[in-house]
Amino acid sequence: TVGADRVPVFYIRGNHEIRNAYSIGLRSLFDYVGDKTYGAFNWGDTRIVMLDCGEDKPDTHWVYYGLNDFSDLRKAQAGFLKEELASRAFKKASKRVLIHHVPIFGKGEDYDSYNPCRDEWGAILEKAPFAVSINAHTHRFAYIPEGADGNNYPVVVGGGYRMDGATVMILQKKGKEMTLRVLNAKGETLKELNL
């Protein structure tokens, strides 16, 4: 079990949670910061910034029947990001963590050539002083070191839904020390970062 009664669990949706018959009711299951699917908040002296990437296909793709408008959502978040990075709460934080579903940084066969989040937010996030970015989407664990693809911070991408590729990330902060540990389904450590 996750133990959400004792340990904070923060939910951020991915593209699959937007597509199914239950997606419309998903909002009723979670409290959203500022009633938006993206936002920022402090957890102790750590600033958590969560972004909503929307879908991984253009709004005009036939599967959406003209019902999606994630382009405007991403544009709104670009404005939010500029304000957030300039905010007192962000600047005062001892650590800053970025969380979003689709990786903005990273290259190779696992990364989509269509990446509107990188187009919209990449220039804003390139120099941002985050300790780490936590992502998913590719269904394969990856570690992108700081500076490998224009990223100013390490990027950790979680694994997939199958047991042979599944991962769990444990972000922990004690005092001034922050660590991120990535485990596979066997409980083996794939990566441990001192942030």
Task: Label every model-predicted segment.
Residues 172-195:
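A short C-terminal boundary segment appended to hydrolase-like catalytic domains
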